Amino acid sequence: MSSKRAKAKTTKKRPQRATSNVFAMFDQSQIQEFKEAFNMIDQNRDGFIDKEDLHDMLASLGKNPTDEYLEGMMNEAPGPINFTMFLTMFGEKLNGTDPEDVIRNAFACFDEEASGFIHEDHLRELLTTMGDRFTDEEVDEMYREAPIDKKGNFNYVEFTRILKHGAKDKDD
């Protein structure tokens, strides 16, 4: 029996925790639908979606996926796919944005004092002259609802939170 346990430990990686509260991204009915979908895919009912679960689910739909295809799907997750990871992955796909820490770290590259702020003029210059260049109109649109203080400092930590979770009500 102990040899079975040892073997199980070597084949399963420990699930990573999501960096943000993914359950806040969806209402209860959406979470319930995702849970039902997760349970339909988790064919062996072990609480994780693995390659075999994906194969069995796709086969039940009349598909015959290749091993490479299944590996590609599994590699989209940073670890074992439990329900929280499943919800996180779907949330990011549905919202079409990168994880919160990736966005925040992209801004942090230009925050020389690690303060959580970048002056709006400096950020405008960066956004309009580097990489996939923004137009001034696009920067203006971004700044319209952005957390910028009276000194012109753009709070990218708060902006990232708003981007991923929505703005707080003005009454809060």
From Swiss-Prot:
Matches recorded under InterPro entries: EF-hand-dom_pair (IPR011992), EF_Hand_1_Ca_BS (IPR018247), EF_hand_dom (IPR002048), Myosin_RLC (IPR050403)
Keyword Phosphoprotein: yes
All residue ranges annotated as the EF-hand domain in the record: 29-64, 98-133, 134-169
Entry-annotated residues carrying Phosphoserine: S20
GO MF assignments: calcium ion binding; myosin heavy chain binding; structural constituent of cytoskeleton
UniProt GO BP: stress fiber assembly
Name by which UniProt lists this protein: Myosin regulatory light polypeptide 9
Organism: Mus musculus
